[in-house]
Amino acid sequence: MYQPDFPTVPFRLGLYPVVDSVAWIERLLEVGVRTIQLRIKDKRNEEVEADVIAAIALGRRYDARLFINDYWRLAIKHRAYGVHLGQEDLETTDLKAIQAAGLRLGVSTHDDMEIDVALAAKPSYIALGHVFPTQTKQMPSAPQGLAQLASHIERLADYPTVAIGGISLERAPAVLATGVGSVAVVSAITQAADWREATAQLLAIVGVGDE
């Protein structure tokens, strides 16, 4: 049963692009995306604070669910909709501070053991990946594939879930067929020949999520 310690999110967050710049945040919110994550890696807080502030402001302007990857202190300081953390971040993050600030929390997982760890934190949603091979990020684990994804979805029942990793426009329908609540994409949009058309087609398949 879905009983997070953090504020809840809709079961369906819809199409969930993960991007590395404020420019992409603005572009995608302008064309109708309503769940999005700013993921900037390996920079100091002071180097990314201006981008975090700008992204959060855009999220508010478009009434969107804007998640900040990793930089949880900045997310709290500037009142983001939510924070997304990897497994490696859970032990070094003050989860109670995120909870007390009223921010939603998403947690990455790659196997059953990591799902156990995520469930212990009782986040707002659980991300499951990587589903397919991906070039976006170096991954120590093997791709899960659709059958394993479906197994995780069955286990998690009504817990909001997000599939991520190598999901293309062509693969999105099969991913949704597993029962996953949401689909995260990276290169399917940012490396598309026509990002507007790719986003429109993905929105038509996945949707913008529930209110």
From Swiss-Prot:
Pathway: Cofactor biosynthesis; thiamine diphosphate biosynthesis; thiamine phosphate from 4-amino-2-methyl-5-diphosphomethylpyrimidine and 4-methyl-5-(2-phosphoethyl)-thiazole: step 1/1. One of its GO terms (cellular component) is cytoplasm. GO terms for molecular function: magnesium ion binding; thiamine-phosphate diphosphorylase activity. 2-[(2R,5Z)-2-carboxy-4-methylthiazol-5(2H)-ylidene]ethyl phosphate binds at residues 134-136, 166, 186-187. Keywords: Magnesium, Metal-binding, Thiamine biosynthesis, Transferase. Mg(2+) binds at residues 70, 89. It holds the Pfam family TMP-TENI. Its cofactor is Mg(2+). Transmembrane segments: none annotated. Coiled coil: none annotated. 4-amino-2-methyl-5-(diphosphooxymethyl)pyrimidine binds at residues 37-41, 69, 108, 137. Its EC number is 2.5.1.3. Binds 1 Mg(2+) ion per subunit. It catalyses: 2-[(2R,5Z)-2-carboxy-4-methylthiazol-5(2H)-ylidene]ethyl phosphate + 4-amino-2-methyl-5-(diphosphooxymethyl)pyrimidine + 2 H(+) = thiamine phosphate + CO2 + diphosphate; 2-(2-carboxy-4-methylthiazol-5-yl)ethyl phosphate + 4-amino-2-methyl-5-(diphosphooxymethyl)pyrimidine + 2 H(+) = thiamine phosphate + CO2 + diphosphate; 4-methyl-5-(2-phosphooxyethyl)-thiazole + 4-amino-2-methyl-5-(diphosphooxymethyl)pyrimidine + H(+) = thiamine phosphate + diphosphate. One of its GO terms (biological process) is thiamine biosynthetic process. Gene3D superfamilies: Aldolase class I (3.20.20.70). HAMAP family: TMP_synthase (MF_00097). Condenses 4-methyl-5-(beta-hydroxyethyl)thiazole monophosphate (THZ-P) and 2-methyl-4-amino-5-hydroxymethyl pyrimidine pyrophosphate (HMP-PP) to form thiamine monophosphate (TMP). Belongs to the thiamine-phosphate synthase family. This is Thiamine-phosphate synthase. It comes from Salmonella choleraesuis (strain SC-B67).
